[in-house]
Amino acid sequence: MNLNIETITHDDFYEVKVGGELDVYTVPELEEVLVPMRQEGTHDVHVNLANVSYMDSTGLGLFVGTLKALNQNDKNLYILGVSERIGRLFDITGLKDLMHVNEGTEVE
């Protein structure tokens, strides 16, 4: 399955809209987009998962790595548009306490 990825550069953050299934086969596509953003370290990153129908632990691992890299530059990762099902992954793993995870598509 292919992953649909749209990126928008705002003045103070990058917005990444993701659609499809985020798993071991598709995470490398998203990683190609996120790695340069986290290496640059000049903007927060907002990842919108509203159109993601499935995500496994590989996706969680990518977000943990992105968060760590951004935090080194005093920047943050915001995971937005999280469905109830995907939200449970963040809850069960305790990652919801470490990063900004929101069911809405805007940063609160």
Curated annotation (Swiss-Prot):
Phosphorylated by RsbW on a serine residue. PROSITE patterns: STAS. The keyword Kinase does not apply. Signal peptide: none annotated. The modification Phosphoserine is found at S57. InterPro entries: Anti-sigma_ant, STAS_dom, STAS_dom_sf. Gene3D superfamilies: STAS domain. It holds the Pfam family STAS. It comes from the Bacteria. Keywords: Phosphoprotein. Residues 3-108 form the STAS domain. PANTHER family: ANTI-SIGMA FACTOR ANTAGONIST TM_1081-RELATED-RELATED, ANTI-SIGMA-B FACTOR ANTAGONIST. Belongs to the anti-sigma-factor antagonist family. Positive regulator of sigma-B activity. Non-phosphorylated RsbV binds to RsbW, preventing its association with sigma-B. When phosphorylated, releases RsbW, which is then free to complex with and inactivate sigma-B. This is Anti-sigma-B factor antagonist. The lineage of its organism: Bacteria, Bacillati, Bacillota, Bacilli, Bacillales. The gene is rsbV.
